[in-house]
Amino acid sequence: MNDTLVIAGKHYRSRLLVGTGKYKDFAETRAAIDASGAEIVTVAIRRTNIGQNADEPNLLDALPPDQFTILPNTAGCYTADDAVRTLRLARELLDGHALVKLEVLGDPKSLFPNMPETLKAAETLVKDGFEVMVYCADDPIQAKMLEEIGCVAVMPLASLIGSGMGILNPWNLRLIIDNAKVPVLVDAGVGTASDAAIAMELGCDGVLMNTAIAAAGQPVLMASAMKKAVEAGREAFLAGRMPRKFYSADPSSPTAGLIGS
């Protein structure tokens, strides 16, 4: 089945995107990402060395850009100006790379997005030639505004970053999905494989996660589980689930021709 994720005109086989933080070392990072099957890996530019610090280990030695699509992100940014400045630095470090993940946080406790600053940054970045995938609240109106600005994907949170609380508001996610003309990916809050499957069954185009894999007891094994969950959820969405029924007068096995009837 030729069913690919298309972002900014590029096709990807995997619908699972993964982060690179919180692992014990770069070797574990690489092993988990290999197990996940992810092709897009996101990197926090303010926290991870991809060349800006020559004396420190470079993540790109473990995850070469010719093997993965590197997605720089603005984790740790609380203003539009900080986010724009960070992504311009990333573009320099990655030789003009345009695909980026924008997140502008509202408060350090919840890490909930600051949507006015996110909208402001998105507008600046799109005008500056970036292809913006954007972390946002699960607000259908604001998600549509980001799409209309020109973002190439909208990424509403399922629940708070790092919380592992799963899909808390499936109805808003469905509204965003139904209204969108760009890919919709769940970003933040996934805790285990069933959460990823549910997101895909709702019709999300993909799932981005980090802590759910990196903080698992066995990150490499969890990465493999997430790969399978995303694939299963996507196939279930495409197949179409049976209607929900409170009672069923339609048994699975036919009643005609029963012995003794």
From Swiss-Prot:
Pathway assigned to this chain's UniProt record: Cofactor biosynthesis; thiamine diphosphate biosynthesis
Protein residues bound to 1-deoxy-D-xylulose 5-phosphate: 162, 188-189, 210-211
Location in the cell: Cytoplasm
Keyword Cytoplasm: yes
Catalytic residue list: 101 (schiff-base intermediate with dxp)
One annotated Gene Ontology cellular component of this protein: cytoplasm
Origin superkingdom: Bacteria
GO molecular function: thiazole synthase activity
Record-linked Pfam families: ThiG
InterPro entries listed in its UniProt record: Aldolase_TIM, Thiazole_synthase_ThiG, ThiG
Broadest EC class assigned to this enzyme: transferase
Entry keyword set: Cytoplasm, Schiff base, Thiamine biosynthesis, Transferase
Gene Ontology process terms (BP): thiamine diphosphate biosynthetic process
Recorded catalytic activity of this chain's protein: [ThiS sulfur-carrier protein]-C-terminal-Gly-aminoethanethioate + 2-iminoacetate + 1-deoxy-D-xylulose 5-phosphate = [ThiS sulfur-carrier protein]-C-terminal Gly-Gly + 2-[(2R,5Z)-2-carboxy-4-methylthiazol-5(2H)-ylidene]ethyl phosphate + 2 H2O + H(+)
Key word Cytoplasm present: yes
EC number: 2.8.1.10
Family: Belongs to the ThiG family.
Subunit comment: Homotetramer. Forms heterodimers with either ThiH or ThiS.
Purpose of the protein: Catalyzes the rearrangement of 1-deoxy-D-xylulose 5-phosphate (DXP) to produce the thiazole phosphate moiety of thiamine. Sulfur is provided by the thiocarboxylate moiety of the carrier protein ThiS. In vitro, sulfur can be provided by H(2)S.
Name of this chain's protein: Thiazole synthase
Organism: Azoarcus sp. (strain BH72)
